[in-house]
Regions:
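Conserved phosphate/anionic-ligand binding catalytic regions in large, soluble enzymes, centered on
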Residues: 1-11, 143-158
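Phosphate-rich cofactor/ligand-interacting catalytic cores and adjacent structured alpha/beta frameworks
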Residues: 14-144, 161-165
């Protein structure tokens, strides 16, 4: 649901930029998305009828709504700079996992699981190898941890990279 919300929002922002003859840049796209969602966290985070809302109530993580409100700061600051590097797609994902309070991880594994995964991602980021990435994947499967929010943010980074370039 988070990826659909985010990509729909970014497509709407893209359309508005085109309609207003504004340049399509990552900054313009994300700034407009932030304007379009200003206050969404405060307005919508009172309920607990989704995993994201329940995690917000329990841990304070803002999830996809917070990312949108921030103009997808995690995508711009953590993922996008990695994409041009060798193994950039892996490094972008690891950078996101290492720093984002992923609501899916919190839902499945709590703060302890999130801290474990973030620590592993930071270590792997600095000493990257495909085999170590595969090992982390197996460990996540064994622990029933899925950084789905970070995967959504990576998809957003790919989308932004493709429409900007």
């Amino acid at each position: 649901k988070g990826a659909l919300f985010s990509l729909g929002l970014l497509c709407a922002a893209w359309g508005r930029l085109q309609a207003q003859n504004q340049p399509l840049t990552a900054e313009n796209l994300c700034d407009l998305a932030a304007q379009m969602t200003a206050g969404i966290t405060r307005r919508e985070m009172q309920a607990t009828d989704t995993h994201g809302l329940a995690v917000h109530a329990a841990y304070g993580a803002k999830g996809v709504r917070g990312e949108a409100e921030s103009g997808f700061a995690s995508v711009r600051e953590l993922a996008m700079p990695q994409l041009s590097r060798p193994n950039g797609r892996y490094l972008a994902l690891l950078s996101l996992i290492a720093h984002v309070r992923d609501t899916n991880v919190l839902h499945r594994a709590g703060e302890e699981g999130l801290h474990w995964l973030q620590s592993r991602a930071k270590d792997l980021f600095s000493t990257f190898s495909i085999s170590a990435m595969e090992q982390l994947d197996r460990e996540c499967i064994d622990r029933n941890i899925s950084p789905g929010g970070c995967a959504d943010l990576l998809a957003i980074a790919f989308f932004m990279q493709s429409v900007i370039h």
